[in-house]
């Protein structure tokens, strides 16, 4: 069964733009408003981060957003209960470290997710070899477990991951944490082009994407981008008009590969 998320992000004329927000940053009452705003801005899907006290993959902007959410007593269960009432039409993606999911209980987590518009799941600290901790519970659902692949992964590993990939492949474009960057590794284009050539699902570039130039660069070699730290920071600074204009422009970038 092809997942809803794959169909939504599959190659079209324009780059797929997925945005990241921290669930509960600014309070849970703002979550639906943020989601509807991003949907109206033309993004393809929205990633919702779950606040966690030890966020190993997050850069400083997202770490601060997580701390703000934790101060509001935001939890994974509270976010999912809020999302169950969401009117958003585009797919949502939960990005959570494994601990909050274990704490809630995997069966209960999957049960709650299925009552929401969430169609994808990213667990950055769950190694590919340990995915069977959660994949049995996802069998027969429309929830894709999205793999992250790094710049340093050998070709054999990339091929193994691509063969099993659902939703899309999250291609990490830097070695390190998330955050706004001005430049990328010189080998990134070849890495993404190779991934694209072997992947049965869309390939999206993430970590450090923060400008229209970045979106245009990656539109030459993959299917789209994930924009995180820039979105989190601009929402926090209440620069919604500027952010909306940026995202609309990003969503108009044409795929050139």
UniProtKB/Swiss-Prot annotation:
The keyword Transcription does not apply. Its EC number is 4.2.1.20. The active site is at 47 (proton acceptor), 58 (proton acceptor). The keyword Metal-binding does not apply. It is an enzyme of class 4 (lyase). Pathway: Amino-acid biosynthesis; L-tryptophan biosynthesis; L-tryptophan from chorismate: step 5/5. InterPro entries: Aldolase_TIM, RibuloseP-bd_barrel, Trp_synthase_alpha_AS, Trp_synthase_suA. One of its GO terms (molecular function) is tryptophan synthase activity. It catalyses: (1S,2R)-1-C-(indol-3-yl)glycerol 3-phosphate + L-serine = D-glyceraldehyde 3-phosphate + L-tryptophan + H2O. GO terms for cellular component: cytosol. Keywords: Amino-acid biosynthesis, Aromatic amino acid biosynthesis, Lyase, Tryptophan biosynthesis. Disulfide bonds: none annotated. Pfam families: Trp_syntA. It comes from the Bacteria. Gene3D superfamilies: Aldolase class I (3.20.20.70). Tetramer of two alpha and two beta chains. Belongs to the TrpA family. PANTHER family: TRYPTOPHAN SYNTHASE ALPHA CHAIN, CHLOROPLASTIC (PTHR43406:SF1), TRYPTOPHAN SYNTHASE, ALPHA CHAIN (PTHR43406). The alpha subunit is responsible for the aldol cleavage of indoleglycerol phosphate to indole and glyceraldehyde 3-phosphate. This is Tryptophan synthase alpha chain. It comes from Listeria monocytogenes serotype 4a (strain HCC23).
